[in-house]
Amino acid sequence: MRARLALRLAKIEVQIQEIDLRNRPPELYAASSKGTVPVLVLNDGTVIEESIEIVRWALGGSEKDYALIKRCDGEFKQHLDRYKYSTRYENVDPQFHRQQGSLFIEHLNDELGKADYLAGNEFGIPDLCIAPFIRQFRAADVKWLDEQPWPALHNWLQRYLESNDFKAIMVKAIP
């Protein structure tokens, strides 16, 4: 999601190919031996295999932009996975991971209380990289998250979900 949004914001036209992860086509493995998505194959044959690297390639950014993203991709993502997908792990307490993930969300709410976006006054790289994961965290229990006392985060996430750019990247490509 964040790779698609970065490419859209950078106005880079790409051909999107939807992949059924239960039935990965040989072309995916030909482009990337890892067989994971996203994969961006440039005209010169260069392959970029990670969403964060696609964001860097498309939009650049500073180390400051990526500091909060690194925290999200590390500790928060670990808690998100064990909260939302607890059945994939042994001996996992999803409520513990929800509580631990909430600490990061509380930090985001505090930051968003100072400015409209994580990047400051405008939607930027930290916003486009972190919002998809907050959306996933919310999807695990919408009612619970919506009841939390995080007004700045709720407003930020709602603006993201209602944005034309988000709606555009959520349209499924025709196979």
Role assignments for model-derived ranges:
Residues 1-102, 109:
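GST-like domain detector, emphasizing the conserved glutathione-binding G-site
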Residues 16, 121, 146, 169-170:
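A generic structural-conservation signal
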Residues 37, 63, 117-118, 169:
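Secondary-structure boundary/capping residues
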Residues 68, 72-162:
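GST-like fold's C-terminal all-alpha helical module
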Residues 163-167:
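A late-sequence structural motif
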Residues 172-175:
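Long, charge-rich low-complexity segments
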